[in-house]
């Protein structure tokens, strides 16, 4: 293992503040999965352990636990910290059902939805003007699924052009829509989940060929975005289970 200089650590702290495209991963399972899927490009790993609990051929620095705590976003980080950037890939036409997140801002909701999408066979996720997928809370709440799915970040206009180019079918959730439990879907579709406070934007809603709703007892205005999106995805893919 290498011994870092004081300037090396200071530079990492500066990059943490200024370079929002960098990832600081402090969960061993998430690091292992991301490395295995080749969805990140690791720059180095810091650890307070005598040896890493997984194979890694890059630079490894032995540091005090306090250094990892200073660079981590969690209160009780594990003893391994991977500094990396996301691998770049070309946006491809979905081959399965897919999820569309329209300007969601809660990283916990986004992480939950990405994880659920993976479980439901929705292999593609389109994030339109959302919190960045490098967000540490998003990564933790997805339990690393953000590195195991095709997650694309783009603007609304870019997505609109993409939908029109590939003639994709979308559905969105609306209180005036049809009961999701009474519908069957016989083609590949994208499920649109809107902003926590404003719902689906007008531009994206116009692309949807159908609106659906989750029936609820009176007195409940709406469900959390993560909950409603999960229910809809499971219902659409129920025949797969």
Labelled PLM ranges:
Residues 118-120, 138-145, 202-241:
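Structured adenosyl-cofactor binding patch, chiefly the S-adenosyl-L-methionine
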Residues 60-85:
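Glycine/small-residue-rich loop that forms an oxyanion/phosphate-binding "nest" at active or ligand-binding sites
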Residues 1-4, 25, 61-64, 149-157:
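Short acidic-hydrophobic, aromatic-tinged amphipathic segments that line or gate anion-handling sites
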Residues 1-49, 130-131:
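Boundary-proximal intrinsically disordered activation/regulatory segments immediately upstream
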């Amino acid at each position: 293992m290498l011994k870092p200089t004081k300037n090396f650590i200071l530079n990492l702290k500066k990059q943490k503040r200024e370079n929002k495209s960098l990832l600081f991963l402090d969960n061993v399972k998430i690091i292992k999965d991301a490395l295995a899927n080749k969805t990140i490009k690791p720059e180095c790993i810091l650890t307070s352990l005598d040896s890493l609990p997984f194979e890694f051929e890059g630079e490894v620095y032995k540091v005090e636990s306090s250094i990892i705590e200073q660079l981590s976003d969690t209160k009780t980080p594990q003893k391994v910290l991977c500094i990396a950037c996301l691998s770049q890939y070309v946006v491809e036409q979905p081959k399965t059902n897919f999820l569309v997140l329209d300007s969601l801002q809660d990283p916990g909701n986004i992480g939950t939805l990405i994880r659920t999408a993976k479980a439901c066979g929705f292999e593609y996720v389109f994030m339109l003007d959302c919190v960045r997928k490098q967000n540490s809370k998003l990564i933790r709440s997805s339990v690393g699924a953000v590195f195991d799915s095709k997650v694309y970040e783009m603007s609304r206009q870019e997505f609109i052009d993409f939908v029109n180019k590939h003639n994709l079918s979308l559905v969105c959730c609306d209180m005036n829509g049809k009961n999701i439990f009474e519908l069957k879907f016989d083609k590949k579709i994208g499920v649109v989940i809107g902003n926590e406070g404003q719902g689906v934007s007008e531009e994206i809603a116009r692309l949807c060929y159908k609106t659906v709703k989750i029936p609820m007892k009176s007195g409940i205005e709406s469900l959390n975005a993560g909950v409603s999106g999960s229910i809809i995805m499971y219902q659409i893919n129920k025949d797969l289970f």
